[in-house]
Each structure stands twice: as structure tokens, then as C-alpha cells.
């Protein structure tokens, strides 16, 4: 109440910010006549003048009014478009490192030019991040005219580009590209073997278009670069025959033993997207595996040596019960292609990790591709937080404002519209069954079609879009279908979705980034005419004029019919996605309307609100085909959506907390790697490694502050001679001396070590040997880092079980991953020193050949793939941590001893004795820990 009163008196935070920005708008507008009077050459010279002023110490904030006024004037001359005042506000919000929420059709692309131009003056690079290559290329070409006119260079970073083209794109003042490509380039830059092979500059400033889609929807899963691992394809085929032999349990068993409607062998938890074997299912699966010869007599499926079987069985169960054809994926030729759940687009080249993709391939009977080993990985949260300044724009960010602030430190500012919105959002209509719902949708579409009103129908899956298309064909209503299967025609279909009587079916937000103009997009059509080389210039001009006249007539006709009508056939689990669909209508003050048609069969209602709504319908004795249209039901659905959004936020937050641990380690490894790459001679670094290795070795035989009787000098001599090629007569030295300190012996060892090292360098020369050392360090660091990533994956997958031991899984993960990281650094240090000391090289040519071979072995990774999964094991861990289920995980959490990472990499689990330390890393004996479960 008090908060509301204060808002009335002082205005909300958003209103106060807008008021501050409006004061600057007045300054910019006051400069307009001055810049209008300048010639083209004088206006273009302003960019260099701004750069000189910036170099002398003037800030970008001080340059803002003039720079915005110059950009606006240049846009009027080059683009024939003048920035509205609200677009100037949007530009200032972006420059301040905030998120600008601008309604669809308010000109986000043009708004961004202001902040991009101002920040490009600094010469440190500006990245404009889009959701796909098409938009990156379109915006770079479209806005590139303006930037080039102002003397700025523009690059576009595409997936298909060659290495030198990418370097040129990043060297430009402004670089357009997709979120995935920027992230993958960062990872690839940290895998190169020569500093000149890098493409990115330090990350300075990024503007993320459709920021909600990139930083929230796609942030649940990491970017992964992977290479081929061990072949388990036959095991996937054999496991695929098991799920059909098991029956699904209906209902989840509660603590009091109730809740199970129909007993079965496994239970599917749709909320957490997981499958769990019941006790009966566990026994049945063991019997099947025993008969198949995959499990030995008397062995448990949960025994450590059978973890691989467990992993494959769960992958197969999930493939059969949670992932459905034409909803989560499509089959094209001999390939399973993932469908993006948010856009409905096909994600070519992407694969689910953790064996899930192979399990789906086995289910569909297509060729099973080998599993991959992670070579490098990062989450979008941690990639984008590396930019010195980050900003974003979208039509729908306000519902996620808290998350943007909490995770990225980004404030959301809602920008006022240039014209008052005219769209009417009608009440949801809820039907008992899907059939009744679709009947109502067809009636609504027919009504609009007969009145000449264009309709955009939103569906949540390819399956539903094809079902609706079938129903419209039966009803003899012409229409266009826009889903992942029609990706190539996407922009063309969306551009014409505003023509009279046009009915367009779209999965979710496919076609985002292309405006739906009432009467159709005349610019697109004119573009096709201008690109037709068979026409003369006169004919092109005549046809374009004719198109513009026709468009004006169609535009007025559609406005009179009520503008674009949006039909939602199902609520998405996020209110933001629903708002995006609604936002396609009523752009720039145009008329428009929207309505959602729901049924109690919808997944969202079934899981979260179905019983409550069904009870209301039964109480009201609703006849068949009659919808319920009430605020209480809509509020009930929004409450369900808020629950899902809250849960997804928790998953992303937990994902980030886990990845922050790996991120700290990633930063240290990449920093060390960059030091090696940039150093002309890494001799000092090698010396530090060498000294610490031999001090540690010496102390293993001669403990600090120990008595002479405790020294094992003969053993130390033998180890130095046999393992390191270093001869030191330690026993003789002690025998000849009346008394000697251990520090004197250490000095003697170090001098002998340095003498051997100096001899190796002298053989081939310092310059050649430095190159060899650099190659060895990079090879060792990269190999051990990959093994470390595999070990972290395994640790992460089972860590939530620590909750049962009253331990905080996140703290346990931090502790154990830190121990693993310590081992990683020890392994690198020991391996580098050992290779340098044991290498037998007679000539400079041999040394150079060895260096080249090392780099070639590492750079020629087989089957390298770039993945950004829809839902990965990382997100599952976060979900498991938030809502623990009493099942044993499919993979061991962690293995003690130096062989753990290598074993994890090969997918092998060593047999564990009852009195050995438990593989989970708890520190307990196996029989007292996970041995109980076996």
C-alpha cells in the first residue's frame, strides 16, 4: 500500500528514467537544424572529429547528444528514415548498458544504430548479436549502408565463413553475428596453437537483439565443442529393445504409499523432464539384461562396473517416453534433427548430449553416430558477462526483468510506444477437449477469412501445426504453414502474412525479426522485382510503382477489417512467448486483435491447473462445445505459467551457480594458455614448473624437518636417474660430509637438473627449444583440460545425491571440483617437465618435426561438432538439485586417484573393492557409502 502511494507521488523507477532521458532528447532535437544545414562531406567528417575528441579524453556520454544527432541526420539522408524521440530514448538505454523493451514494429533495428554508432567511435569493436544468420546478414546489409556512409566498417560473422573472413569481420568497427557463433569463436580462440590464428578482439560492447530469447530461453544449456569418443553404438541398439518390454507407471508414489493409479516399471516426471525406474522395473530390467548377456549373474545394475549400462538404459527410456517425433525432433533421411522448442526451427548440426541423441537414433532406426567427448564448453551467461558493457532489446522483457537484473546485472527499461496501441486482447476460451477447441479455432478463422481479415495462428509444435493445416484443408480454407520444415521460405511467408484473407500457421515465434505489415510487405515484393535481371530499369520502376499503389489499397482494406488477428491454439509455459505472439498484431498503432483457445488436454493445464479448471466446468455444468470464458480461469492459467517460469528461473540460476565453478577454472586455464601463446620464450614459466616438480620429488624422499635416518637418498638417486635422466651422487655426498643440511642436498639436485636442461637447450639452440616447450605445454594443458571437463561432467551428474547425506550439493561440488583442478595443474606440471627431460633429440630438424607433430595431432580432432543443446545434463543436474528424487544416478560422481579423468574419458569405470574409497568422492569406504545401494 505504501509502495503504491509512493509510486503515485514520485512515479515508478521506469517513469523517472524516461523523464531523465527525455531531457537529453530535447538537447538532441535542438541540434537537428544545425546538422541539417551541413553538407554530406561535413556530416561525414564528424565521425573522425568525434574519434579525435574521444582520444583526447572526452567521454562517450559527453559526445552522446551530438553523435545521436549526427546518426539521426545521416539516417534521414541515407535510409530515408528519421529516428522518433522514443527511439532516441531506446538508443540511450542501450548505451547505458540496459535492456530496452520496445513493442513489435517500433523499429528496434533502427534504434540500435544510435548506440552502435556512438560506441563504435571508441574503436574497440561493437558486436550486434542476433538469433540467426539470416537476421545477422539482413541487418548488416541494411544498416551497413548507414555505417559505411558515416565512415565506419561493418563485418558479418557467419557460420560458413573461412578463418580469414572471420578475422576481417571481427576487425571491423561493428560486427553482426549470432549468439552461437560469437560463443563458439571464443571457445575456438582458446584452442588455437598460434596467436595469429585468433579471430576475436577483447570483448568490449554487445547489443543483443531478442535478448530474452538468447539470454533466457537459450541459457538453460551450454555451448559445447566436442570430438569423437569411444564407440558404444551397438549397446544403444541393444538397449533400444528394452523400453517396449517395460510398462509405464501412472501417478507418482507419495511418502504415504498413495498416488499410484496404475503400477508399472518406470515413472515419467514431466515437470522435471526425467524418467525413473521403480523397484519392480529395476528387477525386470536386470532380468532382461541378464538374459541378453549384458549383466553377469548375481550383479546389480547399480554396481559401479555397470554404470555404463545404467547410463544407456536411462538414455533409452528417456528417448522413448519424453522425446517425440515431430515435436522434439524430426527425421530427415538418415538423420535425427532437433526442433527448437522456442521457435519451432530445425537445429541443423546440433545434438543432444549424454547419449540421448544416440538413443533417439536407435529408437528411429537411423544410423547411430558415435558419442562425443567435450573439448570446450561455456554457458551464454558466462560468455556474455565477459563483455565490458552489455545491452539488449526485445519486445517482451518486463516479465523477466528480475532475472535479467539478478543474473546479468541488466536493468529493464520499458520504452513508450510512438503511437497508442490499438490491439484488443480478448479473453481466453477454454474447452473440455482438443476437438472442441479446434472446432472453435476453425470457426474463428472462417469468420475472419470471409471478412478479408488476415489471421496468424500460433501453435506450440510442428505436430499441432500440421494437424491444424489438415483441419483447414478439410474446411477448404486456403493457408500457409510456417514451421521448421519450411525454414527456407520463412521470411517470405511472414512478410506477406498481413495481406487480406491470408491465413498463416506458425510454430511459436518462427519468423521473429520480420515485420508483418498490414496489406503485405511491399518492400519485400519490390526487392524481388529489382533483383529480376530479365527486366529493364523502366519496367522495374513501373512494376514497383504499381505494387505501391496496390499495397495502399490493400492496407486500408485490412485496417477496415480489423487488422491482423492472432489466434493462439495453446498457452506456452512462458507468458513472454504468449506476449510475443500477441505482439505480432497492432504494430505502430495499427488495429489488431488476439485470442487464445485452450483445452483441458493441453500440457500446461494438465500438469499445473487442469483439475481446478475441470472442477469449475463441472460445477457450471458446461455443455459440450461451450467454452468457459472467465477471469478466474485466465488467472489460474497465468498462475501456472508463473510457477513454470519460477521453476525455469531456478534451473537457470542453479545451472549458473554450478557453471561459475567451472568458469573460474576456465578463466585460469585460458589465462595460462594465453600467456604461453603470447610469450616469445616461455622459459620462465617452464623453469617455475621444473623447480616445483623437483622440489616435490625431493621432499617425497627427504621430508622437510626430518632426521637423516629418514632420508631415502638411494631411492631418490635411482628415480632421478631412471625416470628423469639426472645423475646426482647424493649418497656419496652425504658419506663424504661430516654433517649436511637437507637444503644443501636440494641445491645439489637443482644444480644437476639445470645442467641437464642447459645441455638439451645447447644441442639445438634456445629459439628452437623454446618453440618445442611451447608446443609441449599447449598439448599437455589441452589434453588434461579435456579430461578435466569429462571428470567435472561425471561429478556434476551425481552430486545432487549428496543432499541425502545432509550435505549441500553445491558446496560439495565446489570442494571436489577444486580438488580435481588442483590435480589437473599437478598433472600438467609433471607431464610437461617429464616430456622435456626425457625427450631424446639429436638435431634442430628433429625438434621442429616433434613440435609440428604435437600441434598436428591436437589440431586434427576427429568429428568436431558444435552443440547448443535444447536441454542438457547440466540443466538436469540443476533440476535434480532443486527437486531430489531417490534414484541412483546414471553415472558415477567422481573417481579418486590420478586415473579418474582418463577413466571418465574412456567411459570405463574401475571395479571398486568393498574397502576402497567410494567413487563418489565422499571420503567414505565404498561399503559404507554407495556400496549399500549395490
Curated annotation (Swiss-Prot):
SMART domains: SecA_DEAD, SecA_PP_bind
Binding positions (Zn(2+)): 918, 920, 929-930
Enzyme class: translocase
Keywords for this protein: ATP-binding, Cell inner membrane, Cell membrane, Cytoplasm, Membrane, Metal-binding, Nucleotide-binding, Protein transport, Translocase, Translocation, Transport, Zinc
Annotated ATP binding sites: 87, 105-109, 515
Cofactor: Zn(2+)
HAMAP family: SecA
Family that this chain belongs to: Belongs to the SecA family.
Stated name of the protein: Protein translocase subunit SecA
Amino acid at each position: 500500500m505504501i509502495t503504491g502511494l509512493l509510486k503515485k507521488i514520485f512515479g515508478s523507477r521506469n517513469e523517472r528514467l524516461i523523464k531523465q532521458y527525455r531531457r537529453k532528447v530535447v538537447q538532441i532535437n535542438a541540434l537537428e537544424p544545425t546538422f541539417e544545414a551541413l553538407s554530406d562531406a561535413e556530416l561525414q567528417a564528424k565521425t573522425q572529429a568525434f574519434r579525435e575528441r574521444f582520444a583526447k579524453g572526452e567521454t562517450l556520454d559527453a559526445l552522446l547528444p551530438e553523435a545521436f544527432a549526427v546518426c539521426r541526420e545521416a539516417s534521414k539522408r541515407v535510409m530515408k528514415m528519421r529516428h522518433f524521440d522514443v527511439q532516441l530514448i531506446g538508443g540511450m538505454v542501450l548505451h547505458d548498458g540496459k535492456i530496452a523493451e520496445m513493442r513489435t514494429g517500433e523499429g528496434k533495428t533502427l534504434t540500435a544504430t544510435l548506440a552502435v554508432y556512438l560506441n563504435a567511435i571508441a574503436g574497440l569493436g561493437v558486436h550486434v548479436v542476433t538469433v540467426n544468420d539470416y537476421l545477422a546478414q539482413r541487418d548488416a546489409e541494411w544498416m551497413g549502408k548507414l555505417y559505411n556512409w558515416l565512415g565506419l566498417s561493418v563485418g558479418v560473422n557467419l557460420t560458413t565463413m573461412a578463418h580469414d573472413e572471420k578475422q576481417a569481420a571481427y576487425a571491423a568497427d561493428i560486427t553482426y553475428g549470432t549468439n552461437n557463433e560469437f560463443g563458439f569463436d571464443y571457445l575456438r580462440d582458446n584452442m588455437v596453437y598460434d596467436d595469429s590464428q585468433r579471430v576475436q578482439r577483447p570483448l568490449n560492447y554487445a547489443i543483443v537483439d531478442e535478448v530474452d530469447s538468447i539470454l533466457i530461453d537459450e541459457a538453460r544449456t551450454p555451448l559445447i565443442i566436442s570430438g569423437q569418443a569411444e564407440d558404444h553404438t551397438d549397446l544403444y541398439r541393444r538397449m533400444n529393445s528394452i523400453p517396449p518390454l517395460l510398462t509405464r507407471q501412472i501417478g507418482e508414489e507419495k511418502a504415504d504409499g498413495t498416488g499410484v493409479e496404475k503400477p508399472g516399471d518406470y515413472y515419467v516426471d514431466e515437470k522435471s523432464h526425467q524418467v525413473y525406474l521403480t523397484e519392480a522395473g529395476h528387477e525386470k530390467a536386470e532380468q532382461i539384461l541378464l538374459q541378453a548377456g549384458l549383466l553377469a549373474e548375481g550383479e546389480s545394475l547399480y554396481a559401479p562396473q555397470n554404470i555404463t549400462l545404467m547410463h544407456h538404459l536411462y538414455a533409452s527410456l528417456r528417448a522413448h517416453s519424453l522425446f517425440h517425433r515431430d515435436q522434439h525432433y524430426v527425421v530427415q533421411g538418415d538423420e535425427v534433427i532437433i526442433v527448437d522448442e522456442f521457435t519451432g526451427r530445425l537445429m541443423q548440426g546440433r545434438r543432444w548430449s549424454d547419449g540421448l541423441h544416440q538413443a533417439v537414433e536407435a529408437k528411429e532406426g537411423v544410423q547411430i553416430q558415435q558419442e562425443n567427448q567435450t573439448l570446450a564448453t561455456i554457458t551464454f551467461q558466462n560468455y556474455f558477462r565477459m563483455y565490458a558493457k552489455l545491452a539488449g532489446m526485445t519486445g517482451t522483457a518486463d516479465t523477466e526483468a528480475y532475472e535479467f537484473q539478478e543474473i546479468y546485472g541488466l536493468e529493464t527499461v520499458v520504452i513508450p510506444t510512438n503511437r497508442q496501441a490499438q490491439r484488443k486482447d480478448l479473453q481466453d476460451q477454454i474447452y473440455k477437449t482438443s476437438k472442441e477447441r479446434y472446432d472453435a479455432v476453425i470457426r474463428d478463422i472462417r469468420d475472419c477469412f470471409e471478412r478479408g481479415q488476415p489471421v496468424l495462428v500460433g501453435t506450440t509444435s510442428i505436430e499441432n501445426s500440421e494437424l491444424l493445416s489438415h483441419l483447414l484443408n478439410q474446411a477448404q480454407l486456403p493457408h500457409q504453414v510456417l514451421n521448421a520444415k519450411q525454414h527456407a521460405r520463412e521470411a517470405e511467408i511472414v512478410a506477406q502474412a498481413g495481406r487480406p484473407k491470408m491465413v498463416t500457421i506458425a510454430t511459436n515465434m518462427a519468423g521473429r525479426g520480420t515485420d508483418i505489415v498490414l496489406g503485405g510487405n511491399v518492400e519485400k515484393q519490390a526487392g524481388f522485382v529489382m533483383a529480376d535481371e530479365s527486366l529493364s530499369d523502366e519496367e522495374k520502376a513501373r512494376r514497383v510503382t504499381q505494387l505501391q499503389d496496390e499495397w495502399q489499397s490493400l492496407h486500408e482494406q485490412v485496417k477496415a477489417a480489423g487488422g491482423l488477428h492472432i489466434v493462439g491454439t495453446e498457452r506456452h509455459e512462458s507468458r513472454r512467448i504468449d506476449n510475443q505472439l500477441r505482439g505480432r498484431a497492432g504494430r505502430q498503432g495499427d488495429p489488431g486483435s488476439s485470442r487464445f483457445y485452450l483445452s483441458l488436454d493441453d500440457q500446461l493445464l494438465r500438469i499445473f491447473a487442469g483439475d481446478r479448471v475441470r472442477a469449475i466446468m463441472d460445477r457450471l455444468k458446461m455443455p459440450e462445445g461451450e467454452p468457459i470464458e472467465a477471469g478466474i480461469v485466465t488467472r489460474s492459467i497465468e498462475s501456472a505459467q508463473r510457477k513454470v517460469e519460477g521453476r525455469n528461473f531456478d534451473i537457470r540460476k542453479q545451472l549458473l551457480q554450478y557453471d561459475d565453478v567451472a568458469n573460474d577454472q576456465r578463466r585460469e586455464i585460458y589465462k595460462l594458455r594465453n600467456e604461453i601463446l603470447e610469450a616469445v620464450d616461455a622459459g620462465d614459466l617452464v623453469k617455475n614448473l621444473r623447480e616445483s616438480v623437483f622440489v616435490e620429488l625431493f621432499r617425497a624422499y627427504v621430508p622437510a624437518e626430518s632426521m637423516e635416518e629418514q632420508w631415502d637418498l638411494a631411492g631418490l638417486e635411482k628415480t632421478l636417474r631412471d625416470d628423469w635422466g639426472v645423475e646426482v651422487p647424493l649418497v656419496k655426498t652425504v658419506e663424504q660430509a661430516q654433517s649436511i643440511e637437507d637444503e644443501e642436498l636440494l641445491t645439489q639436485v637443482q644444480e644437476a637438473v639445470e645442467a641437464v636442461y642447459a645441455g638439451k637447450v645447447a644441442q639445438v639452440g634456445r629459439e628452437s627449444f623454446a618453440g618445442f616447450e611451447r608446443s609441449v605445454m599447449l598439448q599437455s594443458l589441452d589434453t588434461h583440460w579435456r579430461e578435466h571437463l569429462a571428470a567435472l561432467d561425471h561429478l556434476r551428474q551425481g552430486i545432487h545425491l549428496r543432499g541425502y547425506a545432509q550435505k549441500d550439493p553445491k558446496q560439495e561440488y565446489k570442494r571436489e571440483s577444486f580438488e580435481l583442478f588442483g590435480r589437473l595443474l599437478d598433472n600438467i606440471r609433471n607431464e610437461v617437465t617429464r616430456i622435456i627431460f626425457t625427450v631424446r633429440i639429436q638435431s634442430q630438424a628433429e625438434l621442429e618435426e616433434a613440435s609440428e607433430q604435437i600441434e598436428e595431432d591436437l589440431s586434427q580432432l576427429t568429428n568436431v561438432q558444435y552443440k547448443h543443446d535444447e536441454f542438457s545434463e547440466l540443466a538436469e543436474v540443476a533440476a535434480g538439485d532443486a527437486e531430489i528424487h531417490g534414484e541412483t544416478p546414471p553415472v558415477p560422481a567422481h573417481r579418486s586417484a590420478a586415473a579418474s579423468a582418463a577413466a571418465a574419458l574412456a567411459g570405463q569405470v574401475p571395479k571398486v573393492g568393498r574397502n576402497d574409497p567410494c567413487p563418489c568422492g565422499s571420503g567414505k569406504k565404498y561399503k559404507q557409502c554407495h556400496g549399500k545401494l549395490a
